[in-house]
Amino acid sequence: MSRLTIYLPEVHKEFFNKLNFIYVFLILLFFSHSLFASIVSDTTAPKYQQPDIHHYIEERKTCKAQNVHCQGAKFTTINITTPNEKGLSHNKYDEFTLKLGRGHNKVFFNNLMIDSPGFIGNPNLVDKAAMVILNEVTSNKKSELHGHLAVIGHKADVIIANPSGIYCNGCQFSNTDHVTLTTGIPTFRSGDLGGYYVTQGKIIISSNGLKHNDNSNVFLDLFSASLIINGEVRSGDVLTATGNNDIGIMPIKGSVDLKPIGDLSNSNKIDVVVDVTKLGGMYANKIFIYSKDGGIHNKGIIEAETMADLVSASFIKNNFGKIDSPKIRIRSSGDIDNIGGRIKSRRQGLSYNANDKFGIRIFGRNVNNSAGSIYINSGHISVGAVDSITNRDGIIKSIAVTGGADIKMKAKKVNNDNGYVITTQNIEIDATDLANNRGKIVSAFSHVDLHYKTLSTEDGIIHGGIEVKSEVKP
């Protein structure tokens, strides 16, 4: 059910009387589709899953006439459905879009049990407010979110699930600790939300970004077949899981179980499923990016206050991108490229577990840091590869005033031609073939331990503040 309130411009009475019914109807139709959020209940769903939707345009005093060219804020209030015994309010829609307009657009999820200033209590809330508000789109219409979405009343987790895709350009969320955007189909377990079945759909964060940071203790989940970030994403903890996955959650805000769907060798899979463009960025306390059947490409900024964790079954490219966090883990079954990129950990002065000595861990089939930078100011660096590590014209550096600063590198081939591996403490390199032509492997105050079968170091420098140990493998 929908209620529409419209402020039409004042017109001369005689002229208005000449308007026929059809013309008036067309004007109303134009206003209803262009001024408001296009949020429409799924009338084919059971009644108890159909939310009540109400629209309102606020009068703007500076407007001579309220019309599409001059108007106040546009509000859409959703009286969410009655929550079940688990506190889950399941709402189904034919369309869920918050349109871009001249005013300040807002969608309110009404979780009020009683009236409050400016709002009427939700009659669907009989004996309790919702803990989780699930908004499921059942049609083939993608969701476009261009404004502010807020829970009024009791704080609740908000989920928008649309297999046809979600486009966010300046969307904001408030009064909710946990937001989930997904192109998966919700799954259930004993009346509770069990997770999402993701086989299609794209989430796009456009230039005006996504904001969800009422405070640092909030969670943002992005679950989709593919993800494009072309603007800033800001939240507390961010978890992205891309590709075809059966995602299990228990409970919400708790652990997440990812089970890939289908054959990972499928030739039809998407090559890049997470793409952070040059104009894109992710800023959060913790950032987890998991790609089960495609690659991760970052040309923008991934910046986490506590941890950044990137995992891909295909490849990870940080070419000319930036990853910045006190603790960084980058793992892939394929290649990892940091060509011209920066991977930086700043832990000096921060308190962390004494056993958590590694600030940066990188492991892939091949790791390429050509003209790139891997830097930490307190803690160890570990770079490992199944086949090769290339640091040609690159820098791997660990400089610490206090605490650990070891650098460990292990692969069949390690190439440091014209490169720098520098630390104040220990360096350990284990390789079959080690090349350091015109390169520098330097420990300012401690040991350099080299294990290799062949060594090429024309015009190269290998220096240990205490000593250099070399072991030639049989």
Where are the regions that the model predicts?
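N-terminal secretory signal peptides that target proteins for export/translocation
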Residues: 1-18
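N-terminal intrinsically disordered, low-complexity tails enriched in polar/charged
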Residues: 3-7, 38-42, 473-474
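Bacterial N-terminal signal peptides
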Residues: 22-34
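Solvent-exposed adhesion/ligand-recognition segments of exported proteins
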Residues: 36-303
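Extracellular beta-strand scaffolds
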Residues: 85-88, 103-107, 113-115, 139-143, ...
